Amino acid sequence: MLNVFTLANGRLFQEEIDSLDELTPARPVWVDLEDPTPEEKGWIAVRFGLVIPADIIDDDLEESARFYEEEGAIHIRSDFLIDDDEAPRNVRVAFILHENVLFSVHREDLPVFRLLRMRARRIPALIEDAKDVLLKLYDADAEYSADTLEGIYDDLEKVSHRVLNSEVNDQAAAGALAAIARQEDLNGRIRRNVMDTRRAVSFMMRARMLNADQFEEARQILRDIDSLDSHTAFLFDKINFLMDATVGFININQNKIIKIFSVASVALLPPTLIASVYGMNFKTMPELDWQFGYPFAIAVMVASVITPFWYFRRKGWLN
């Protein structure tokens, strides 16, 4: 899918392009390619003289391959967060700033992009050129990360009440561990996301491509990211605490089970010993010829079971 965005009356307007003829007269500040076809890439090459490589959004964490200038164009690759309840993930986006037009290439639509499109349509003078689009995307990305962190706070608060304010059985503990693991994964993705945004914005500042107002906006984005770092660190500590508490409750429940088996084994040991003794069946055993030998042995075995249980209960070991 290929969308172009043009400025008119201080607002950003979107137009979906279905052919080269539709693209030719356009004068966009931003061209967004979502999972582009080779044909759409060919239109870009014809209209703007820009060749988009086939591997432009391949994963590569080397900084030299993610931020560079080539033939007058600035190339930036960044990760953007998608907070999906089923599968949160970081999506790679490749930006190319070429002749005052921003080109973005990605495989799926992103919440940050939708947020910017909505704001740019409603707020006049929000965007003046292609570099503003890129900065506003990073600003919206930091804001989206902050909103997602607030969601983690809320979810962990619910887990905390479930773990700390009630009797936790194994099933509840397993559910709590799964919820904690999901939040830990999401928090890690946010931390990776803001780290990547910091590197991209810092590169733009070092490249001397921003005017004074844009440079100040970039500094504000970095300050916002710095504040998010402390929140992600705190959430990691809280997640570790809840994880340890939940595992502790699981250990307590397991110890209760082991305690029951231990008490049962100790209580059943004396009658087993008595039964073993009388099972020897030696001729010299007087109880074999005694009329009440069998009920006597049964009574002794029952008493040997009751006595340990009575003693354990008195000591409070069965509570």
What do these predicted regions represent?
Residues 1-206, 210-213, 220-227, 231, ...:
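Peripheral, non-transmembrane regulatory/ligand-interaction domains of membrane transport proteins
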Residues 223-319:
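Hydrophobic alpha-helical transmembrane segments and their immediately adjacent juxtamembrane loops
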